[in-house]
Curated annotation (Swiss-Prot):
Changing residue 134 to A: Decreases affinity for UAF2 by 3 orders of magnitude. This is Splicing factor U2AF 35 kDa subunit. Residues 212-222 have a biased composition (Gly residues). SUPFAM superfamilies: RNA-binding domain, RBD. The lineage of its organism: Eukaryota, Metazoa, Chordata, Craniata, Vertebrata. The modification N6-methyllysine is found at residue 39. Residues 188-208 have a biased composition (Basic residues). Residues 183-240 are annotated as: Disordered. It comes from Homo sapiens. Signal peptide: none annotated. A zinc finger (C3H1-type) spans 12-40, 149-176. Plays a critical role in both constitutive and enhancer-dependent splicing by mediating protein-protein interactions and protein-RNA interactions required for accurate 3'-splice site selection. Recruits U2 snRNP to the branch point. Directly mediates interactions between U2AF2 and proteins bound to the enhancers and thus may function as a bridge between U2AF2 and the enhancer complex to recruit it to the adjacent intron.
Length: 240
């Protein structure tokens, strides 16, 4: 019996635990759900609830008419948001393996951002700190999420352009970033690892030669890059 219960845990056959919450970390019934939402006590993944505001869903003029937002403007706005959050997570809390943003319209998924860290300790640290912070004038609601495999959480029909439920689908509709930004963010991490390795080699050679300043050039470049990034960030509307 115990083996059977373990085998169906989190599936639709499980009459006790909510399969949607287990797969997606969110359920449209919320606290009213008849099944249990087992919130994890440890996880690599955190959820920042309802933090992304899609201008195409919310932009209205003073007379209540909807303002047109071009696809180019929309992508630029989204890329800026994604880069700001991704950079903040890595610089303050730890290495990010994956970050995803929901483009759904249902209250339980709209604007949710899922950040999967390499280490569970970093995820725990992030949740504790973020719940005392604000973003874009709103308090952040962060929690550990049971989602670790986004392939199970995503709507396959949406990825093929065939989802008939639209924005109110109960599976994740993930909003993609531009290819350029993906290369920059995830490529930057690979460069950082290579840079650290080269920096250690330089410091080792410097110590062998009796000089102590071999690693300073790399740090200065990194500082200038951070300054440029912060300057760009100050121009953005969404601020931590």
């Amino acid at each position: 019996m115990a083996e059977y219960l373990a085998s169906i845990f989190g599936t639709e056959k499980d009459k006790v635990n909510c399969s949607f919450y287990f797969k997606i970390g969110a359920c449209r019934h919320g606290d009213r759900c008849s099944r249990l939402h087992n919130k994890p006590t440890f996880s690599q993944t955190i959820a920042l609830l309802n933090i992304y505001r899609n201008p195409q869903n919310s932009s209205q003029s003073a007379d209540g008419l909807r303002c047109a937002v071009s696809d180019v403007e929309m992508q630029e706005h989204y890329d800026e948001f994604f880069e700001e959050v991704f950079t903040e997570m890595e610089e303050k809390y730890g290495e990010v393996e994956e970050m995803n943003v929901c483009d759904n319209l249902g209250d339980h998924l709209v604007g949710n951002v899922y950040v999967k860290f390499r280490r569970e300790e970093d995820a725990e640290k992030a949740v504790i700190d973020l719940n005392n912070r604000w973003f874009n004038g709103q308090p952040i609601h962060a929690e550990l999420s049971p989602v670790t495999d986004f392939r199970e959480a995503c709507c396959r029909q949406y990825e093929m352009g065939e989802c008939t439920r639209g924005g109110f689908c109960n599976f994740m509709h993930l909003k993609p970033i531009s290819r350029e930004l993906r290369r920059e963010l995830y490529g930057r991490r690979r460069k950082k690892h290579r840079s650290r390795s080269r920096s250690r080699e330089r410091r080792s050679r410097s110590r062998d030669r009796g000089r102590g300043g071999g690693g300073g050039g790399g740090g200065g470049g990194g500082g200038r890059e951070r300054d440029r990034r912060r300057s760009r960030d100050r121009e953005r509307s969404g601020r931590f």
